[in-house]
Structure formats: C-alpha cells, structure tokens
Amino acid sequence: MQERYQPNSVEAAAQQTWQARDAYLVHEHAKNPDGSEKPKFYACSMLPYPSGKLHMGHVRNYTINDMMARQLRMRGYNVLMPMGWDAFGMPAENAAIKSKVPPAKWTYDNIAYMKKQMKAMGLAIDWSREMCACDPKYYKWNQWLFLKMLEKGIAYRKTQVVNWDPVDQTVLANEQVIDGRGWRSGAPVEKREIPGYYLRITDYAEELLDQVSTNLPGWPERVRLMQENWIGKSEGLRFAFPHRIAGADGKLIQDGKLYVFTTRADTIMGVTFCAVAPEHPLATHAAQSNPALAAFVEQCKLGGTTEAEMATREKEGMPTGLTVTHPLTGAEIDVWVGNYVLMTYGDGAVMGVPAHDERDFAFARKYGLPIRQVVALEGKTYSTDAWQEWYGDKQAGRTVNSGKYDGLAYQAAVDTIAADLAAQGLGEKQTTWRLRDWGISRQRYWGTPIPIIHCADCGPVPVPEQDLPVVLPDDLIPDGSGNPLAKNEAFLSCSCPRCGKPARRETDTMDTFVDSSWYFMRYTSPDNDQAMVDARNDYWMPMDQYIGGIEHAVLHLLYARFWTKVMRDLGLLNFDEPFTKLLCQGMVLNHIYSRKTPQGGIEYFWPEEVDNVYDAKGAIVGAKLQRDGSEVNYGGVGTMSKSKNNGVDPQSLIDTLGADTARLFVMFASPPEQTLEWSDSGVEGANRFLRRLWALGYAQREAVGRGLATGADWAQAPAPVKELRREVYGLLKQADYDYQRIQYNTVVSACMKMLNAIDDAPLPEGPAADAARAETLGLLLRVLYPVVPHITWHLWQDLGYAEHLGDLLDAPWPHVDEAALVADEIELMLQVNGKLRGSIRVAAKAPKEDIERIAAAQEEVARFLEGRPPKRVIVVPGKLVNVVG
C-alpha cells in the first residue's frame, strides 16, 4: 500500500478492475445466494444532450444517481442505472453550420468524449443498455408509434397558427416559448399559419390531471402543482353573441354567432366590449376594408402564441367597427381586436367585463371603454379609478345592476344565466383546458423523420411498417438556409405506397421531446429489433426513482406521462405512470463578475481572474481584476453558465484532485434538492478529508490486519473500545436513515464524524482495540463507498477486508449492532437547588437510590449547600439529578 493518496492511480486501478469484471452489467430476475429473487430498483437520471463536455450540473445529477444505485445494491436490490444520449436537436445543426461538418459527426464525437468523462467519474452504469436518439434502431420506434397513433386518430395533420422561431426556422411548442422568445435561439417568436402533425394529448387531459394527485405521491409538490396548472382545467359557460355580419359570399360569418368561454358567467351583464384574436374571421373581415386595422393585425402576428407571453405583453387593441348583440339585454357590443387574445384557446374571442377582470379593467381604462359594476360586496365601495382585488372575488359577492339576476350569489347566478342562454340555444356549460394538442412537426434536419409520403393523387400516405425506419441521411451539412432535407433528392424522391406513382417524402422531423418521452423504457429492451419494448419492460417499469432538473416539470415530464398512457392503450405496457418517485436536484451556482464594455455590452470574467473585496463582516462587496487592479462588478451567485464565464470544468478537477473529490464535494455542500454554491475551499476540504482517510488506513493497516484475523469479545472489551463502537454505530444508524431520505449531505457529515471518532479514539493496545479498529474502519468504508467508490474500494482491498469479507462491490450494507449502542455508563447533569453545578457518571442501569447517594456525596453539593444535609434528591432518569438543600 502506498503511503500517500494518489487519486489518479487509485481511480484508474479501480475502474480497470470494474470494467474487466463487467461489474455493472445487470440482468432481470437476479437471484440471491439462497435462490430467492432480488427486488428490483430502477434509478435513472434524465439523459443528457451531447453538447461536448460534462458540466457540474451533470456531475451532481449523476453522483446522486450513483450513490443511490450503489447503496441499494448493497441492500440486496437488483439495481438498473443506464445512460443514453438525447442526440437530436438544433444545437447539432448550429454547430454543423459553424464547423462545416455533418451533425452526426459532431454528435458522435461529443458522445465519445462525454462517455469517457462519465467513466472517469466511476459511475455504476450498465453501458450494455446505452441508447442514442439519432440511431435508426432507436428512432424507428418513434416512427412506428407515430403510425400507430395515426391509425387510432391520436396523431393528425392540420393547419394552425403556430409559434415560429425566425432564427432556428422551426415551429415551437407553447412550452418552448419563454417570455416571447425561442427557448434555444432567444429570438422573438412570430405567429404563422403552417400545416403540421399534432398529437391529441388533450384526449388524456382528464387522466393526466386526476393522476397528478392520485398516482404521483413520490413527486415534489411544486412539480405536481406546475403540471396541474399547465393542464389547466376550467369549468364555465360557452355562449354566443349573435350578429348579422356577412362575409364576401353574403353568408353570416360563423353562422352569425361570436362564441366566447367564461368562468364568470355571473358577470355577463357587465360586458361592455368583446375582443377577438388577430386571426379571428371577424378580424380578417374587418381588416379587408380598414388598412390601419390590417396593419395592426400583422403587427400582432410578430408575437408568440403562449399564455405566458400574453400575460407579460402590453395589452393593445383596435376597434373593428363591428358590433354583436348581447344575448340577454339585446344591447349592441363593440368588437375589438386584442393582441392578448389567442386563436388557439377556446373560440379565439373573449367577453370584456372591465369591472370584474383586471386585464379588461386595464384595457378599458387605456381605451376609454365603459366600466359597469355588476357584482358588489357588503361594506365595499366600487371605484373605476384603480383596480382592487375584491373586484374579482366571485365567492363573497352578490350580483347588482343585473336586472332579474340581482342579488344572486356566484353559483346561483351562473346556473340561472346558463339555463336562460341554453333555452335560447345560445349557450351551455363546458369544461375547457389550458393544455393544447402537441404539435410535433419541426422544419429541421436533425431529428426523427416523420414517416409520411406526399402523393399528388393520394395525399399524405403513411410509410408502410415494413419500410421502417425512414433513415435520416447522416452526411448532410446544413448551411442555415432552411431544412437541407428539402433539397436532398436522394431522400425526397420515392414512390407512393398506395398508387406507385412518384411522390415526395415529408421533410419535417419530429420534436426532440418525442425522443425523450420513452427512452427510459428502451433501456429495458435495448437489443430487441422486433418490438419497441418487451417483457423486460414489465420487470423494470415503472421506474422507481427519476432524477432531473425542475426545468423539465412541464415539458418532458408531461409528455413522458402522455406517451406512457398511449403505449398502455396500444397494449404495449400495463402501467399508468412512468415514474414512481421524482427528485429534482438543485442548480450549481458560482460567483458572477462583469463590467460594461465601451460598446455598451457586458464582459464577464472567470472567478479565478479576480480578487474579491470584503466588508468588515466578510461579505463580498466588490472585486478587482488581478491583471491590472481595475474594478469589476460583483453580481452575486448565479447558475453556472458558459456565457457568464462562471462554470467549473469537471475534467480539470478530476485530473488534478480526482473524481472522488468532485463527488464528495457536490454531495456534501448542499442537500440534493437545493442549490449548491461552488466553493474552491470546499473542494479543498473534500480532498483533505480523503487524504486523512487514506492516511488513517495506512497508519492502521497492521492493526486492521490483526483485528480482521482475531475478532473480539465485545462484552469484555475495555471502556474506550465500547465507547468508539457506540459512537460509530450511532453514526451508522443516522447515515442509514439519511440514505433512505436521500439526504446525502448529512450522510457525508456522518462519515466525517466517523473518521474523527476512529482517528481520535484513545484505544489501548490489544486484540479488542485491533478488532475495533478493523470493525469501525470497515463500517466507514462501506458507508462512504457509494459517495467515493474508488478510494474506499482500494482501501478495502489493501487493508485485507476483501480477503475476509469479499469484494466491496458485493459487500452487504452493514447492520446496526444495537447492543453496541447501549452504554455501560451514562452522564447525568448535576444540579444543586436547580442550578447546574457539574455532572456525574453512573451505571446505565443504576437504581434510583444509588444515583441519589452518588449525587449527595459529590464535593460540589457539599460546597454549595455549605455543609447542610440535602432535604431531597430529584432524579430525572437519563438526564439529570437535582439535590435540594
């Protein structure tokens, strides 16, 4: 055994041994030595995009997964921890444009490097199950399931107003528009009408919503709430404003009815205007004879189509000059075009009730529209000068200024008004959803080809199943001028499967969220080229623990739930939800330093380029560049980012201090679900702990060897030996509890305390002490092994544990020796007349009389009672004794 800890050689030796043994190769229905079947546990991290290098967020995510997998394997579980690559997507195309190499080469080069990094981290991954989204063997099943959904009517083609990213030249789902900008390019999103394929996720809205509360108890409450809000169930009234507006053909537009949906039918008597979406037929009709309105409509199309954007965009409108009729009063209601109205939600029109809707209130105040109060609260005075929250209270109010409906509470008003509108054939109660069908068509090259052939005679024709996969050419180099598939005759040209005539392939590819909606099931059946999944999927799924960022709460997780339910309904699996438990790890943060450039931009600096300036309390209040002493702005801490120069390269850390140091720091610095602030001193502290562990093993190697060979009679052991065992087993009990709670930072804390206890224990020479050293250090190595597997495995080998107890890879999780936790003696606080004066040690099972006698005989008692005899002695078992005099 070498005297000094050398992480590079230690980690290389361990990894070579594990790889030679296929240590993490997993099979279904694994057996215990007695022939019984091991329980399964499937723990999986969200698959990474192969961007080129791992970042610290990856290191944290995968270390959490690895700790869980290793510890549960020690507990006797058959544990699956796989890995794959979310390899399709726009970054590969953008990189190809820049470097003039095919996206396939860029992607596979990145995968090779990142896989090497993962292996250097010592992750317990079963690489035999590796999948890659851009592999035809994988995306064949995207295409196959799409065709099955097409057969069932779950997939369909339509033309719709969509979010168009003008930079990436593709359609974005609502969830991919952030603050009106494309989630990847950051470009302002436009509205366009374009044909594409959609999946009827709305058919599953009720089940998706219901099972958030019934089937996902192991998910964070925050994520469940985000899913509930995104699905967005609303129960209300859909009704019509009649009109006599005819189109160019002389027919009434939309049969003479402007439909709206509202959850506040009790306020219908307060309608003073209606607003329609820029794409609404009434807006189109009015714009034909109104150039100003036509220009406004075009301006509205420059924005995105999400509710989130509508909530933040300034509300603007323009009157159409058209009117509709109030269905209950007969009054003429002006129709406006509003930039905040979505054609894709409901009927593309809303009623305006300024008195009781904050958005309508602001709109009416801006454009001088009437505001009519129709709900009042007792003791409250209504004013049109400023919005007050009670204006929108639907539970406490009563209707006013509403004719026959005056004096009604919310539900009574809704029911009465709904009945009256239904009697006229103008309305009915209805449930609506925020959730929209999932548009999966993307006008990009690097994605799963949509298996459709377009024939001039037959129209869109599905590719026959036997012709799958439709293989994506992997040698094209995009030039930024649209989809290269549309210019590639070898891909485009084909024959119609139905009539045999020349035809053209669909050039749109699938949204990459299709790839990530079921990859975790392909891990279970990776080598099956005849079926999407097989019986092995039934063994492993549902997944026991999923690990990934909160940023995927709506996008990926909702799509994965939907995809699972579709596969279930197609008879491919027999469960409802894919993920039993979900852990969303916190972001990794680091300090941000910047200053403005002469051109008005912002220049960011690496933390190692600056020296901090501290105040009297040690807080950072500024910073200076090391190279010239000039001041830079300190921006606090933020998520590690390439653009802000505050990332830390994991590979550099692994090369210098080792993977175990990186793993230990990211697990110790913060609970898994909370943010982690990077600290160079914390990293050094983690490395110092590992050096201490190695030094302890080296110093005690001979004693450990003797202890492993001889054993001990613990009942007869000296008191210091018993005390060490009691402390270490107490820490083991705490660590065991924290492992089960996934509180890995306190697991590491317990291990540090164990090391201190073992290192500092004043043990006498002898067999019992040697046995205690061997036992307690062995416990520490096993508890610490899931965190830092390389150093613990090496010490286990070098100190002789493997010879006596087997390889650490297969070592069982240690059991707490409850007898060791029972102390021979206990310490009681000693009080005199209720004031603390010291302590006494007594036998753990000493009778009350003995405790009273020992306490009364203490020198402190005699001194503070000034020689008076005690009047009585009060014993609080296990805590204190109070002598009263």
Swiss-Prot record:
Where would you find this protein in the cell? Cytoplasm
Q: Where is this motif: 'KMSKS' region?
A: 639-643
Q: Which GO terms describe its biological process?
A: leucyl-tRNA aminoacylation
InterPro entries in the record: aa-tRNA-synth_I_CS, aa-tRNA-synth_Ia, Leu-tRNA-ligase, Leu_tRNA-synth_edit, M/V/L/I-tRNA-synth_anticd-bd, Methionyl/Leucyl_tRNA_Synth, Rossmann-like_a/b/a_fold, tRNAsynth_Ia_anticodon-bd
Motif 'HIGH' region covers 48-58
| One term of GO molecular function | aminoacyl-tRNA deacylase activity
Keywords of this entry: Aminoacyl-tRNA synthetase, ATP-binding, Cytoplasm, Ligase, Nucleotide-binding, Protein biosynthesis
Q: Does the keyword Disulfide bond apply?
A: no
UniProt record similarity statement: Belongs to the class-I aminoacyl-tRNA synthetase family.
Query: Could you identify this protein by its name?
Result: Leucine--tRNA ligase
The protein's organism comes out as Bordetella bronchiseptica (strain ATCC BAA-588 / NCTC 13252 / RB50)
